[in-house]
Amino acid sequence: MKYIQVENLLTPTYLSRLFDQVKGMNGFPWYFLSDDVSYSTNGFMFGDTKLLDMPEDEKAIGFTHVLLDQEGVESPWLSHWLPVLDSVQDALPCPVQFLRVRLALQLNNGKMHHNAPHTDSEKDHYAALFYLHDCTGDTVFFDQYDDPNSGLNIDERWYKGRTQSYTERLRVKPEANKLFVFDGHQYHASSNPNGEHKFRVALNLNFLSDDDIFAAKV
């Protein structure tokens, strides 16, 4: 599995400012997701099977805030986060185009199990996670890969992703100011915080590049 990990992406002062923004009573809006905070569970049928239905122990209700996406969504709070996007670009070896940028807030639900394995999109893309604070709730990566050249159509790929068995490959611990970039076809899953940690906030990014960012030299 190829990935890029960057420590101390932002200055400590700016990181603290962003974290205070999303955790305080200062008007920053969070939007409740009653199904699962990992991805949308609407639609996606394969025969009589709802492709994105998931076991109860893999569901994780939570909150989200979309800062930017392909559908034209641009949050009025985006300007506060543009320095993060600039820093991500500066940390990578080639130009990128951001497709979606969203914040996810997960709560301690008492469960130790990871959430549903998934990819953010069936299309070619890169994905990244930026952690705003130290907490429990590892991001789990699996050996399984959604190969776009497998010969399966999109519905078949989704069905395979929902029904196949998964073997754990790597865990990434949420640590303040850490960026973790990976192939968007790699199956992964979030975990809710546990123990003394009551919440977990991470920035999720999806982007394109004309170059192979793992082959290019930084």
Task: Locate each region found by the language model.
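Non-heme Fe(II)/2-oxoglutarate
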Residues: 1-95
